[in-house]
Amino acid sequence: MLPPKIFFEKVKEIMWPIERKELKLFIPMALMMLCILFNFGALRSIKDSLVVPSMGAEIISFLKLWLVLPSCVIFTVLYVKLSNNLNFEYIFYIIVGSFLLFFLLFAYIIYPNQDIYHPNDEMINKLIASYPNFKWFIKIGSQWSYALMYIFAELWSAVVINLMFWQFANHIFDTSKAKRFYPVLGMVGNIGLIIAGSVLVFFSSGQDVIDSELLPDSFNSSAGNAIMLQPIMSIIVTAGIIAMLLFRIINRFILTDSINVLDAKKVTAKMKTKLSVIESIKLVIHSKYIGRIALLIICYGLLINIVEGPWKAKIKELHPNTIDYVNFMGRFNIWMGISCVTFMIIGSNILRRLGWLISALLTPIMLSITGLMFFIFIIFIEEIGECFGDFNLLYAAIIVGAIQNILSKSSKYSLFDSTKEMAYIPLSLELRTKGKAAVEVIGTKFGKSLGAFIQSLIFIIIPTATFDSIIIYLLITFIVMMSLWIWNVIKLNKEYVELCK
């Protein structure tokens, strides 16, 4: 048996591998990530609660393919242009500030006056009757402000988290520090999901946080939705401003005198390396290593998109209005945050003790197991119902899907993100900066958009198709892409080990 002092040192090494002298940098970085992930959790729930009850879960595939993906491409071009003329600090303020301004405009101007901006239902119904194959595009046009909010909420994940925050972290941490810092950063940051879920539940439950049945009937109107939405958006904007202030503090007062990180001036100078848009794209295409990182992101995005569509369709059946949907997603966020923090504690030690390959393989393995369970439950729901009698099968299907989502995303946030970010570190600063911009923004959304393309093509050709009717085809696609993901991780590991030598 170990002496108490050594035992507690071992526990500290497992739970908190951050040294005291590193806290000056770690604490503001962790708080910044907490604020950014709080916004991510809240925005993810709000965007779905707006579009799914009003237009149907099938609309998500059209939004991701026809609106989100082009927006990502446009943003990537703008980002490369900005990076050639401004340093990273100012780019961060411009981008995050633009997001926060839009969220305020949506909550206080666009959403409360949506009846003025949106076309009337009679005209929309006539158009759908005349052009049934284009009914989903017509629905997007009928609720265009919701679609715009969906785009900005999706871009928050791709741009502010994957590109801005992690690129900043990659510039100031080397590989050895990343192994200790990244999992713990994620653990602290994911507390933001728990806080976001609690905020959503509070404002969507009227005056009671726990019992959603006390929700007043008046809240089922668009006015009630606005009453719920405005304070949530105000908190989101406040969290964004705090993140910007923390970023300022890190750049101005911490990086300039820290002996544990790269020199801030050198980083800024290198990040302004001139590179055209075409040259950036060529750089990524000609780099096999960057291509493999992109394939990781594409596989994850496609698989999550394939599973989430049928799950969100089931949620709409149980919670057909916006406020009930927000309430459910708030509770989902709470459990997601708890699971993520737990996985972060486990993941931190897996990454440090078992290495990159095992850590990178655990996410596809977790997703394959839970995803197959969900598909089997949906496909054989009638047979399962015969075994359980009067049990609420719709509720059970939603819970199985929620468990799948929570476990697969927890492993993604704790292990996938950390291993993916570590894969960038051995690269040159030029390839890391410009290549990451293209891979993170375009790659992230291309994966989801590829899954969306498969689904939307079916919905266009067969207007009466639903997720229930195409579930078997989604299962086949799921199995093929999962196999490709696992193969790609093994190949990428060989190149990563070589670069780290």
Curated annotation (Swiss-Prot):
Membrane-topology annotation of the record: Multi-pass membrane protein
UniProt xrefs under InterPro entries: ADP_ATP_car_bac_type
One GO CC term on file: plasma membrane
Keyword field contains ATP-binding: yes
GO molecular function, one term: ATP binding
Keywords: ATP-binding, Cell membrane, Membrane, Nucleotide-binding, Transmembrane, Transmembrane helix, Transport
KW Cell membrane (keyword) present: yes
TM segment ranges: 23-43, 59-79, 90-110, 146-166, 183-203, 227-247, 293-313, 326-346, 361-381, 387-407, 446-466, 470-490
Primary location group: membrane
Subcellular localization(s) per the UniProt record: Cell membrane
Known function: Provides the rickettsial cell with host ATP in exchange for rickettsial ADP. This is an obligate exchange system. This energy acquiring activity is an important component of rickettsial parasitism.
Family: Belongs to the ADP/ATP translocase tlc family.
Annotated protein name in UniProt: ADP,ATP carrier protein 3
Gene designation: tlcC
